[in-house]
Structure formats: C-alpha cells, structure tokens
C-alpha cells in the first residue's frame, strides 16, 4: 500500500502523481467513502490562489459526490479558515487544496476532521486502504449534492477579530502586511483595519502564478524594505495558505516563529493565562528559546517537526501554545490549527497592552545562530545509507562543543534533506552545516 500522506497532507508537482486530476477524483471518492461509513456526510472545500486549484477542486468535488457526500465550495480561503468553518458549518470534514509556502507549480491537499483538527494517522490509514480499491460510484439516487457558500469570508473575519481583546485597539499602529499573493489577500486588510490599524498591504493581487513568488513568510526582503522606507511600526508576512506568520520589527529585523511564541508565552504567563505553564516546540526550535523559557520556569516540550505533531503534543500535555520557527503558531485557546492572522493578533495584543515595540518585546530571548541548508534530492532517501554521515556528524559536534546542536532530517513535504546546525559561534555553525550538506551533493 502506498503512503501518500506526508507531515502536512499531500504535496507535489502538478501533473506528477499523485498531484493529478485522476488521483484527486479517486481521493475524493476514497475520503468520502470513509466518511460515509459513519453517517450522512458533507464536506467543505477551500483552496489557495494557485491556478491549478480550480482543476483539483472540480476533481475532488466529483469524487466526493460519487461517494454520496454533499460538497460545499468556499472558494479561495486560508487553511485555518477552513478548519474553523468546518466546525461552524457542521461539516463532516474540511478540505484545503494548497501547497502552502511552495510556488505555483506545486499543489496539494490537507484534511480537517469535523472538530477542525488535522486527520489522525488512523484516519489517514483508512483512506489509503480505500485508495487501493477500485472506485465504484454510489447509485444515482444517492449521489451527493454540491453548493457554494455565499458569505464564508464574513464569518471568518468576525471570528478572527473576536480573538483580540476588544477592550484594546490597534488605533495608531502603522502596519505593512504581505499576503504572499495567497489566500489571505481578501481577508487580512479587513481584520486589522477594522480593529483600528493603518494598513499598507502588499502582494495582495494573486493571478494564479505569483503565489509565494519572492514574497510572503518565506521571502521577507521586500517587506523589510517597505517597513523601513515607510517608517511603519511593524510588518506582518503570511504564506500562501495563511497558516504561517513571520513579523518584521520597526528596525526592519525579522522576528521568527520561535520568537513570536516566546513573546506570547511570556505575556500569557504573567497574566496567569498560560495553561499548565507549558509550551510545545519542535526539534528545530532555537536553543535560545529553550533557555529563555527555562529562565521563566516555563516547561518546554519537544515534538517532531510539523504542526500536526506539535498539535498532538499540545493535546497530550494540555498546553494551549505551541509552534515552529517557520511560523506555524497554534493558540489552542483561540483556534484549532496554526493561524497566521490570529497569531499576529495575539502578538499585537501583547504589544498594545505593554505599550512596547516588537523590537523590545523580542529582546528577552537571545537567539542562537542557526544555519539551515536544504539539499535537493531526486526522491525520498534513507539517511542510514550514507555511511560517511555518522562520522562527519560526530566530528562536527566535537568541533561545535557544548551549547550546540546538529539536526539532519528528510523533509516530510518536499524532496529535500534539511541540515541544521546551531551554535553560539555563527561562523563555526556555517562551516559545520556546509561540511554535512556536502555529503548529499
């Protein structure tokens, strides 16, 4: 049986299996057949702004209908919005057609349960078993019905605003927002301006091809430039599907997911709101975050890389706050998934209440230099096959000394080997990362 699900759904090149119309048709049928076992089922489908979204939306819709499942179409919508709307529309599942921060040549799909949570491994296994079967449509009298929702944007915008302390206001704040020409393009400005901020919005004119193109959470150079030139108070960057957040302080410096989680954690602890005094991060979380949380007596729990695994650890530990340096931040007391807009609102609430600036708020956490090198591969590989790797890694670790870390892993979403080296000395960390990455070239 093929294993189609990665750490964040399915993702790949459009037109290359499994990212084809034929496969998405069968995938819709397979997921629908699993859902239909439990009750009369309905799903909602959202997508980001890449041109291939229309193709895969139609294929999934046909697959679900052929399994007897009703389908509600949302149109372009951030991933976290679909998680929220799955619950409010009382759907059996939510579906997002997106390749997140990747460029337009890629696409993929993510699923949410009726509770707005990523599907469990058990659920994914059921779907993959169904995919191995022959696709057989239900009878004509049992085919599902399709419809399009008229006002999903308004519901989500009001929900986002409700997560911000309404005794506070963003009045007087000058904010630059980069929508990555993605799914937040028609939502972000409304949320932040209706809370009082002066908004300068950039990269909010998607054409199907420019999603994540030199913009958004994975490429903040232009945003940093605009923040400085306009003398804005801060910048906010989302990725293509709106589940990541990176911020820029008033000095044009990047503030990543680890720093943002720390800012929220410190504030919530001081307010007695940090449930179980616990934060969940990943193996990639900066050592500076570990130390800063420890100094506040906040427990840090380490999960595997991927927001799905962060969520699992949060649920097991009873934590309400977790995230990744890449910008996936989960505020479980506010929503059920990583949400760029809602996470930004939590940081802004801290900023407004403290009458501080983003540059000052991040000073309490001293980041260690972290060098990440992504090495492209033709296919998924097994690290155990690289006999030289263990010897080289041991030598690098000895050179780095204490207060350092080496992490080498196969990406769960792309054909990449990720080599991360972290140490107090940036030059030594860079040399170590290059030595290790050269093994795979």
Curated annotation (Swiss-Prot):
Q: Which domain of life is it from?
A: Bacteria
Entry's InterPro entries? Answer: A-D-PHexomutase_a/b/a-I, A-D-PHexomutase_a/b/a-I/II/III, A-D-PHexomutase_a/b/a-II, A-D-PHexomutase_a/b/a-III, A-D-PHexomutase_C, A-D-PHexomutase_C_sf, Alpha-D-phosphohexomutase_SF, GlmM_bact
Classification via SUPFAM superfamilies:
Phosphoglucomutase, C-terminal domain, Phosphoglucomutase, first 3 domains
Q: What is this protein called?
A: Phosphoglucosamine mutase
The record's remark on the cofactor is: Binds 1 Mg(2+) ion per subunit.
Q: Briefly, what is this protein's role?
A: Catalyzes the conversion of glucosamine-6-phosphate to glucosamine-1-phosphate.
What gene name is given for the protein in this entry? glmM
> Any idea which residues are catalytic in this one?
100 (phosphoserine intermediate)
Task: Give an example GO cellular component term for this record.
Answer: cytosol
Single annotated GO MF: magnesium ion binding
What the entry lists under Gene3D superfamilies is as follows:
Alpha-D-Glucose-1,6-Bisphosphate, subunit A, domain 3, Alpha-D-phosphohexomutase, C-terminal domain
| Record keywords | Isomerase, Magnesium, Metal-binding, Phosphoprotein
Q: What class of enzyme is it?
A: isomerase
Spell out which residues are annotated as carrying Phosphoserine.
100
Report the source organism. Ruthia magnifica subsp. Calyptogena magnifica
Question: Which Pfam families does its entry note?
Answer: PGM_PMM_I (PF02878), PGM_PMM_II (PF02879), PGM_PMM_III (PF02880), PGM_PMM_IV (PF00408)
Q: Which cofactor does it need?
A: Mg(2+)
Query: Which positions carry the signal peptide feature in this UniProt record?
Result: none
E.C. no? 5.4.2.10
Similarity comment: family membership: Belongs to the phosphohexose mutase family.
Instruction: Name its GO BP terms in alphabetical order.
Output: carbohydrate metabolic process; peptidoglycan biosynthetic process; UDP-N-acetylglucosamine biosynthetic process
Q: Where does Mg(2+) bind?
A: 100, 239, 241, 243
Share the record's PTM remark. Activated by phosphorylation.
User: Key word Isomerase present in the record?
Assistant: yes
- Catalyzed reactions: alpha-D-glucosamine 1-phosphate = D-glucosamine 6-phosphate
């Amino acid at each position: 049986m093929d294993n189609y699900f990665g750490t964040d759904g399915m993702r790949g090149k459009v037109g290359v299996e499994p990212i084809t119309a034929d496969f998405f048709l069968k995938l819709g049928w397979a997921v629908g057949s699993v859902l239909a076992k439990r009750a009369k089922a309905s799903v909602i489908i959202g997508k980001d702004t890449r041109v291939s979204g229309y193709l895969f939306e139609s294929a999934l819709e046909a697959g679900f209908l052929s399994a007897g499942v009703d389908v509600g179409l949302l149109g372009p919508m951030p991933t976290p919005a679909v998680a929220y709307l799955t619950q409010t529309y009382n759907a059996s599942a939510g579906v997002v057609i997106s390749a997140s921060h990747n460029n337009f040549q890629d696409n993929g799909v993510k699923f949410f349960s009726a509770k707005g949570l990523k599907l469990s491994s058990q659920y994914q296994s059921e779907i993959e078993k169904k995919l191995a079967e022959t696709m057989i449509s239900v009878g004509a009298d049992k085919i599902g019905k399709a419809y399009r929702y008229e006002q999903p944007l308004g519901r989500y915008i009001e929900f986002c605003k409700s997560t911000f302390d309404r005794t506070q206001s963003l009045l007087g704040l000058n904010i630059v927002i980069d929508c990555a020409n993605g799914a937040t393009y028609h939502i972000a400005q409304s949320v932040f301006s209706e809370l009082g901020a002066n908004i300068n919005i950039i990269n909010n004119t998607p054409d199907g091809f420019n999603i994540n193109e030199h913009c958004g959470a994975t490429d903040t150079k232009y945003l940093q430039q605009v923040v400085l030139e306009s003398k804005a108070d801060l910048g906010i960057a989302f990725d293509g599907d709106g589940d990541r957040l990176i911020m820029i302080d008033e000095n044009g410096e990047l503030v990543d997911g680890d720093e943002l989680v720390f800012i929220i954690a410190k504030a919530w602890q001081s307010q007695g709101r940090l449930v179980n005094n616990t934060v969940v991060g990943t193996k990639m979380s900066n050592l500076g975050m570990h130390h800063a949380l420890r100094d506040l007596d906040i427990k840090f729990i380490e999960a595997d890389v991927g927001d799905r695994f962060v969520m699992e650890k949060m649920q097991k530990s009873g934590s309400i706050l977790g995230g990744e340096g890449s910008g996936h931040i989960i505020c479980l007391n506010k929503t059920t998934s990583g949400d760029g807009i809602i996470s930004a609102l939590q940081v802004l609430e801290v900023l407004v209440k403290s009458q501080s600036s983003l540059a000052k708020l991040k000073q309490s956490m001293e980041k260690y230099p972290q060098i990440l090198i992504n090495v492209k591969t033709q296919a998924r590989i097994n690290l155990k096959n690289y006999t030289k790797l263990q010897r080289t890694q041991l030598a690098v670790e000895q050179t780095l000394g204490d207060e350092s870390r080496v992490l080498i892993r196969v990406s769960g979403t792309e054909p990449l080997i990720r080599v991360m080296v972290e140490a107090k000395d940036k030059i030594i960390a860079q040399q170590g990362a290059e030595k290790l990455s050269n093994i795979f070239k």
